[in-house]
Design a protein with these regions (language model features):
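Short glycine/acidic-enriched loop and turn motifs that connect beta-strands
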Residues: 6-9, 53-57, 103-106, 152-156, ...
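Beta-propeller blade signature
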Residues: 160-173
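Surface-exposed loop and turn segments in beta-propeller and other repeat-based domains
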Residues: 26-32, 73-82, 120-131, 174-193
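Blade-loop segments of beta-propeller domains
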Residues: 27-90
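Repeated scaffold domains used in trafficking and secretory/extracellular systems
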Residues: 33-44, 83-90, 130-138, 185-199
Length: 213
């Protein structure tokens, strides 16, 4: 990535390397990706490229795979709403995946094979009085989708020291539980543009990064 002087925009690229040895590389085999987000690789072999987080590129989600020659092959495109600020993707299976739309307070379910929208899961009823709710990084465990919730005001700052998650049933795509912790003095459950900011260990215990002060 190359950041512009004001810090809110720039150019980012991704490319596939045949090994991890030192070398000299250029962008001749690279693809442009959205600035402010990172490509998301899944266990299925899919690599998703999100649009620019601040809305400076076409609002579309692209799915790629790598062929035997190490070239990127586009497998499909899903058009996203304007000002979505898409930030994270998890796959349930070959027929359902989820993308969190921070700017709209929505988690969108879509078919990763056909790249067609299935449903919108609106989480705006979970917002605090002083903030808007912004779904962030996600993880699936035992048929439930756990979504980190960033409650932020117009300055991207929290109003309360709450850790909050939404638990969604992946069969119905309905909200089952709003999980709130007010005792740890932390906030912002997960970092939205970091898919590794929520993870699960061998015992299926879920861990998440939060912000404190």
């Amino acid at each position: 990535s190359v950041t512009n002087p004001e810090g809110n925009s720039g150019a980012s690229y991704m490319q596939a390397l045949t090994d991890l040895l030192p070398g000299t590389y250029d962008n001749s085999n690279a693809l442009p990706v959205g600035f402010g987000t990172k490509p998301i690789a899944t266990a299925s072999g899919n690599v998703y490229v999100l649009p620019d987080y601040m809305g400076n590129t076409k609002p579309e989600l692209n799915r790629y795979q790598i062929d035997a020659a190490g070239k990127w092959i586009k497998k499909g495109t899903l058009l996203l709403p304007a000002n979505a600020a898409a930030c994270n993707i998890v796959e349930l299976n070959s027929e359902k995946a989820y993308v969190s739309l921070q700017g709209l307070g929505i988690v969108m379910a879509f078919n990763p094979t056909t790249m067609k929208k299935l449903a919108d899961i609106d989480l705006n009823d979970l917002k605090q009085t002083e903030t808007r709710v912004s779904p962030a990084a996600m993880i699936v465990r035992d048929g439930k989708l756990f979504v980190g919730l960033n409650q932020m005001n117009a300055q991207y700052m929290p109003a309360r020291n709450n850790i909050e998650l939404a638990m969604i049933d992946t069969k119905t795509d309905k909200l089952e539980k709003h999980i709130v912790n007010t005792t740890l003095g932390m906030c912002f459950a997960t970092r939205p543009i970091d898919p590794q900011s929520i993870f699960m260990d061998e015992q299926k215990d879920i861990y998440l990064n939060c912000i404190g002060s």
